[in-house]
């Protein structure tokens, strides 16, 4: 038996130890918690969690400086680089910008007679990252000529001779005006990785007024990414900033949600800490993709729906609808959440039915769950219209703008229906619920036997204990008609069940929205232990501490911290399909 399997068995035994104390509950009604007001203890606990998490999230997020000036080649345009004399190159790196194409590379000793040295393909996976220019490694030359095939942006070119960067002259000065940005090697802190090649690029295109490349998701998520770029430039820190910020902002929403549900500061603090330091939450909010914003809006729409069904105030129902609209304009997975909200709303009205009030509420919902979201969704395509030369409010009433929106919906549906390409880290829904197949986002081996890597998967403490607690909630629902458990289960299944029937290629990060409800299920069991077990602190605080300890243990595999490769494998490969 490998040492890593020992950790797996030990953790499962500890989870069982902490949860075995769960008593059989009395029926719990929604809104029955008494002490739901936010107090100074809550402010202190939440403040500490947010501060510690923010430090962890923003540390090593990405470089705050990178090449900002680009030479914008036209197809067929050349740039000649003069090294001053014939030199033997150790190698070269280039930082690619927007658009795809290629560079034909030639070398010359006299600037008149040229020989081919190879080419470099600036394809979509090479954008906004440092790429080794292998064609120039070991070449002896004075002049280098790059000829673009396609309209491509090139940010910086670093040429190394005799072990150091060598200053050169060129008729494309933008290629050598930020030499201090040239790194020793490509790394996730100085380059894009995984789907950042789509979303960060599209965010910049929205800023630049260029029709976006990535149109397989609605626009709002990329517009939020663009806000970070506008603040901090087109740098790794800039395009990841918004996601990390929203990861922090999720925490007060989760804290308030748990406090409203269960009325205990201790439960809210423990649940929020477990959510904050969940692996998926940490990794996914530090990458410039759109899943973070979907989960943020899902949290808010369910929180305000809960406030509505327990308080009956229409403003809460309206806010739930607004956040549903913002979520749907970020990613279609929020539409699944909308189905869950509809079920919760319908159950509420079946229990409080009065025809006149019901019809009025239906009309209200048509406004805030159909009309308002449709307006938000439609308006989010503004950058698409602007890139086609439209401007002002009038574009929204243009048939051309409407065609852009409609055509994109058709494309998205066709695209997502047809994503069946095999991927080494793809996984199915049944693998997500047991954490069986994480998706590896980044892996780099170094000559000294260390490596840097990270991927998306749940903290095994949350994943396994949360699944057990979800099953416990289902038992409570059947035996006691427990309303709190029903609310949690509806939210969980709304996010998970659609993936059971979807045949496209899927990944572990699609389980991110469901993790919100795993936390709530865990807190439901915590609350029962808190109310009925004399030594509840051992169980509740013990499982919370175990979750935080797992985060510390796995931190290198979540942050990209360089560690010894063999040591990481021995300690972190808890299941056969974990890529560590």
Language model segments and positions:
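Hydrophobic, aromatic-rich transmembrane alpha-helices
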Residues: 20-25, 445-449, 453-481
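Transmembrane-helix signature of polytopic, membrane-embedded enzymes
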Residues: 254-277, 310-319
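Short acidic/glycine- and proline-prone juxtamembrane loop motifs at membrane-interface regions
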Residues: 239, 243, 280-294, 333
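Transmembrane helical bundles and short interhelical boundary loops of multi-pass, membrane-embedded
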Residues: 1-45, 49-81, 164, 177, ...
């Amino acid at each position: 038996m490998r040492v890593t399997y020992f950790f797996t068995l030990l953790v499962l035994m500890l989870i069982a130890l902490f949860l075995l104390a769960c008593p059989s509950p009395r029926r719990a009604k929604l809104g029955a918690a008494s002490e739901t007001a936010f107090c100074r203890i809550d402010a202190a606990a939440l403040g500490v969690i947010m501060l510690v998490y923010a430090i962890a999230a923003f540390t090593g997020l990405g470089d705050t400086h990178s090449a900002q000036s680009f030479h914008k080649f036209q197809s067929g345009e050349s740039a000649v680089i003069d090294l001053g004399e014939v030199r033997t190159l150790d190698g070269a790196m280039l930082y690619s910008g927007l658009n795809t194409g290629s560079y034909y590379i030639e070398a010359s000793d006299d600037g008149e007679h040229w020989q081919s040295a190879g080419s470099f393909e600036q394809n979509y996976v090479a954008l906004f990252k440092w790429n080794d220019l292998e064609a120039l490694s070991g070449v002896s030359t004075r002049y280098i000529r790059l000829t673009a095939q396609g309209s491509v942006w090139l940010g910086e070119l670093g040429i190394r001779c005799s072990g150091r960067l060598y200053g050169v002259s060129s008729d494309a000065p933008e290629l050598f005006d930020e030499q201090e940005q040239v790194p020793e090697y490509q790394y996730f802190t100085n380059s894009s990785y995984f789907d950042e090649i789509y979303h960060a690029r599209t965010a910049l295109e929205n800023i630049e007024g260029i029709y976006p490349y990535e149109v397989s998701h609605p626009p709002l998520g990329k517009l939020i990414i663009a806000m970070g770029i506008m603040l901090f430039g087109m740098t790794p820190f800039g395009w990841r900033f918004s996601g990390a910020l929203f990861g922090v902002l999720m925490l007060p929403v989760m804290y308030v949600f748990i406090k409203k549900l269960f009325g205990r500061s201790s439960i809210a603090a423990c649940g929020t800490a477990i959510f904050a330091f969940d692996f998926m939450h940490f990794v996914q909010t530090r990458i410039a993709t759109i899943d973070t914003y979907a989960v943020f809006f899902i949290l808010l729409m369910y929180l305000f729906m809960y406030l509505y069904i327990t308080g009956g105030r229409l403003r809460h129902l309206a806010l739930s609808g607004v956040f549903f609209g913002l979520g749907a304009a970020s990613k279609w997975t929020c539409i699944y959440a909308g189905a869950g909200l509809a079920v919760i709303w319908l159950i509420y009205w079946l229990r409080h039915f009065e025809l006149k009030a019901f019809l009025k509420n239906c009309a209200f919902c048509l406004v805030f769950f159909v009309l308002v979201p449709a307006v938000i969704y439609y308006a989010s395509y503004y950058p698409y219209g602007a890139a086609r030369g439209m401007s002002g409010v009038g574009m929204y009433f243009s048939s051309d703008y409407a065609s852009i929106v409609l055509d994109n919906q058709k494309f998205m549906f066709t695209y997502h229906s047809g994503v069946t390409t095999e991927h080494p880290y793809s996984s199915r829904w049944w693998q997500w619920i047991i954490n069986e197949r994480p998706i590896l986002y980044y892996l780099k081996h170094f000559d000294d036997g260390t490596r840097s890597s990270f991927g998306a998967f749940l903290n095994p403490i949350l994943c396994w204990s949360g699944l057990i607690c979800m099953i416990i909630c289902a038992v409570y629902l059947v035996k006691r008609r427990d309303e709190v458990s029903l609310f949690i289960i509806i939210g969980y299944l709304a996010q998970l069940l659609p993936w059971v029937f979807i045949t496209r290629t899927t990944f572990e990060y699609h389980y991110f929205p469901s993790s919100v409800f795993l936390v709530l299920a865990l807190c439901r069991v915590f609350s029962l232990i808190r109310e009925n077990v004399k030594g509840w602190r051992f169980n509740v605080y013990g499982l919370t501490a175990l979750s935080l300890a797992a985060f510390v243990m796995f931190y290198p595999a979540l942050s990209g911290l360089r560690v010894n490769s063999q040591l990481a494998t021995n300690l972190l490969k808890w299941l056969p399909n974990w890529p560590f």
